[in-house]
From Swiss-Prot:
Lineage summary: Eukaryota, Metazoa, Chordata, Craniata, Vertebrata
Gene designation per UniProt: Nln
Cellular component, GO, one term: mitochondrial intermembrane space
Protein name listed in UniProt: Neurolysin, mitochondrial
Keywords: Acetylation, Cytoplasm, Hydrolase, Metal-binding, Metalloprotease, Mitochondrion, Protease, Transit peptide, Zinc
Species annotation: Rattus norvegicus (Rat)
Keyword Nucleus: no
Catalytic activity: Preferential cleavage in neurotensin: 10-Pro-|-Tyr-11
Enzyme class: hydrolase
Pfam families per record: Peptidase_M3 (PF01432)
One biological process term in Gene Ontology: protein catabolic process
Amino acid sequence: MITLCLSTLRGLHRAGGSRLQLTMTLGKELASPLQAMSSYTAAGRNVLRWDLSPEQIKTRTEQLIAQTKQVYDTVGTIALKEVTYENCLQVLADIEVTYIVERTMLDFPQHVSSDREVRAASTEADKKLSRFDIEMSMREDVFQRIVHLQETCDLEKIKPEARRYLEKSIKMGKRNGLHLSEHIRNEIKSMKKRMSELCIDFNKNLNEDDTSLVFSKAELGALPDDFIDSLEKTDEDKYKVTLKYPHYFPVMKKCCVPETRRKMEMAFHTRCKQENTAILQQLLPLRAQVAKLLGYNTHADFVLELNTAKSTSRVAAFLDDLSQKLKPLGEAEREFILSLKKKECEERGFEYDGKINAWDLHYYMTQTEELKYSVDQESLKEYFPIEVVTEGLLSIYQELLGLSFEQVPDAHVWNKSVSLYTVKDKATGEVLGQFYLDLYPREGKYNHAACFGLQPGCLLPDGSRMMSVAALVVNFSQPVAGRPSLLRHDEVRTYFHEFGHVMHQICAQTDFARFSGTNVETDFVEVPSQMLENWVWDVDSLRKLSKHYKDGHPITDELLEKLVASRLVNTGLLTLRQIVLSKVDQSLHTNATLDAASEYAKYCTEILGVAATPGTNMPATFGHLAGGYDGQYYGYLWSEVFSMDMFHSCFKKEGIMNPEVGMKYRNLILKPGGSLDGMDMLQNFLQREPNQKAFLMSRGLNGS
């Protein structure tokens, strides 16, 4: 997932932060004390600091706001007749870089710092800066000067990306209501500030949640010894199980005690229930009201205008059509799961209730995989120690994209477990950027998997290039005594996916910060990373990614073939669940009066055929609703149509490690960043219109 925390200017995502579609239009260079930082920025290096104290975060936030406001005031007072590209648009673009880099150091620590006070200060900084972003994005005086520039300058004399920057600035100004009356603008501004705070609080609540449950060893039946040994023990000789992914999913997939799974699923989907339900009850109507004031029927209509799908009707047709096509497959998978459950209940003496409960789904889908394909993920993970996976992943990406990675010794990082790498073009030696790897869970850390864009790759005022910097933030299991962190295959896939976002951040080479990295349409942003997931289903790639953690012996060819064949297991139910989440998201953003828990329960029954557990409220734990995917969660499935088309028509056809195809992908899909429309990039790569054939086949359906 891509996490966006500031506007269209930066990629921070998810799998967190509020993704505010605001256009920062800043003016001349900031004055001291930020000048020192600006001079480092001009050198194009990684200038990010992670040692700011809570007081420093507060002080620098106030300084950034005060000095940036002076810049806006200056731009807003330029006489209209004196407005030129150089003194308006170019100046605004130049200062964006300084603002983004400084803001990163202030608001990113909320997601990764080990210090609760630093996280709190960073969260407050994010709230203040988000309010400021809204205030400045609605400066009518600055907007008037940009409009005047478009009306008077010779657009043919400026580069295409600069024209796009100008057009997008005006488009975003109108989407912020700057063409409306002052009274309506003030209403919109006030509501946007409140929405921003609600989004930040929603995800902060999830990040800070530390709920845990206590079970006896018997209640954790069938879980492997290495998992149980990794758990914290209580004074009563029981085991503390958290709701973090490295604990939750192993229990849901392997624990043979239904009551334990029921308690875990209930707790997982009631996280932050009270506070986040209240937030959604405020946030959804606010979004609807803003959309109405701006002339849109619904919030979904508002956000989709900028996406490749364009309309709610196209999204609904896509989801409904896919749901119908998958219905027979889903029914067959449910019937098989029920047969497994009935058999196990008879063997273990459990009462058989004749239905699939929410806490049964992961457990019996895991059994399905083991029975149909003889793939035991618990045994398989012994071949995926994190050091081997990381080495193999980096090797594959380097070879495929013509890059070289070098770990930075004694790097300045926010936690001692974090590592930093420099990325260079293999042919020229040019430094393209850097990325951090933050792989393990800790208290207060962002609890999903995401790529955060920290420093934009773009041109600086002196014509040199600012290197792009990104962070891959995930939560794999911690190493324990005598055993490294071992990844399940689905975690290897997640690693590849998020690193695909990192490569998008690093390889994009744009002129403007606003178009750097993953700043593309939301329903296109997952395309590059999804496409790269295909490598973890390739036998040769899997050999590079695996080695038994004890003696280094490889996975057998037979097991590799079974693993690859298992790709289609449960694909009906897994895709139907994605459709459920997409439909819930669309519903809540087309009718803000709906009850989120009821809407989720309705679609679970109608589409998935597995009822939501009474008393839970999954949408209150659904970070995407407040993390930049509002009205746009469908984008995960929508973009997979494009990613599968690219993979099968080019990489599968020419060889998945073919360096020529890899460079074509790097140059035509990654390098443009957001400087081109997603559909234009796709057609440049495919040399035709995209189609659904490969996507449908990947779901076990007839491609025609």
